[in-house]
């Protein structure tokens, strides 16, 4: 009897709802019964695999809107076999490849114009326009920006990368220490709070190392010096934004190997999360072995954005 009453309540809510929100796979849950949805809108559609995108579509969809960016990260696929079978490709990307007409939103309201400058030219064919001006995105205090009119910087660090205990991920102690110092100074200036800063890195071992560093060096819990600070992987920041992003690249080796950091979509995500300031931390000699990273570093050097003075001494 309790289950019947509960289902009646759920049915009442669903029957009165004009919009039902769920994940793609969640739209197939039995709680929705046989309900049909003639209009389906899938947000972050480029991160959904084709099978998961089909789940809401088969519920009577007559009008489908896919919203996403195929120049950013694709669906996360752990299995190599699944990736080889095509599960790493989204329905969004397939339809674009088939020539389906698209509508691009060309005005961005997140980034300081200088942060937008490189990804706009490199990844979006110069089509992006700014819906905010420089005065609305003042450079944060607490960091010595090489050019205060352009709150973008690359901080060179020499220390080598290392494998974690399981040998499955990579970390870099020197880059972690420099990143810690940058965040500490940004917060000390009083212009930002912990939740305004995002620390981004491509490797889970570096996420763990830096989380421990911030926890032990001031505390991430409520009342701690770094409360509100988020340390996440690049994949964990897609679709999100912060006032300042500090991107710790990790890779540093004499062979010039950068692994999946060479994925231009991963770089695009990392450098487009920041509103007021973007700080990159890394080993330029290693990163320069990759064409996409070489392009970004050349751009930064040409504009005088290399922060050689940070993290020294």
State where each predicted segment sits.
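Conserved helicase motor core of SF1/SF2 NTP-dependent helicases
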Residues: 11, 17, 25-313
């Amino acid at each position: 009897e309790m289950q019947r009453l509960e289902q009646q309540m759920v049915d009442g809510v669903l029957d009165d709802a004009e919009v039902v929100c769920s994940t793609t796979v969640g739209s197939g849950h039995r709680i929705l019964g046989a309900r049909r949805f003639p209009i389906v809108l899938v947000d972050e559609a480029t991160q959904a695999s084709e099978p998961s995108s089909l789940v809401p579509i088969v519920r009577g969809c007559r009008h489908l809107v896919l919203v996403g960016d195929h120049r950013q990260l694709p669906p996360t696929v752990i299995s190599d076999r699944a990736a080889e079978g095509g599960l790493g490709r989204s329905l969004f990307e397939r339809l674009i490849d088939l020539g389906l007409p698209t509508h691009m939103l060309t005005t961005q309201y997140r980034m300081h114009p200088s942060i937008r400058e490189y990804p706009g030219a490199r990844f979006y064919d110069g089509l992006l326009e700014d819906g905010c001006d420089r005065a609305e995105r003042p450079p944060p205090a607490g960091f010595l920006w090489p050019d205060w009119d352009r709150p973008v910087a690359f901080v060179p660090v020499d220390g080598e990368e290392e494998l974690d205990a399981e040998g499955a991920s990579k970390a870099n102690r020197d880059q972690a220490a420099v990143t810690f110092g940058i965040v500490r100074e940004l917060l000390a200036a009083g212009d930002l709070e912990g939740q305004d800063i995002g620390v981004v890195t491509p490797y889970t071992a570096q996420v763990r190392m830096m989380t421990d560093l911030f926890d032990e060096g001031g505390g991430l819990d409520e009342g701690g010096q770094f409360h509100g600070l988020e340390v996440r992987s690049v994949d964990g920041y897609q679709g999100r934004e912060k006032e300042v992003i500090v991107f710790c690249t990790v890779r540093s080796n004499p062979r010039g190997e950068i692994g999946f950091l060479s994925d231009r979509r991963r770089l695009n995500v990392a450098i487009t999360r920041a509103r007021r300031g973007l700080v990159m931390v890394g080993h330029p000699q290693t990163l320069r072995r990759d064409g996409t990273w070489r392009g970004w570093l050349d751009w930064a050097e040409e504009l005088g954005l290399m922060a050689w003075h940070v993290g020294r001494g």
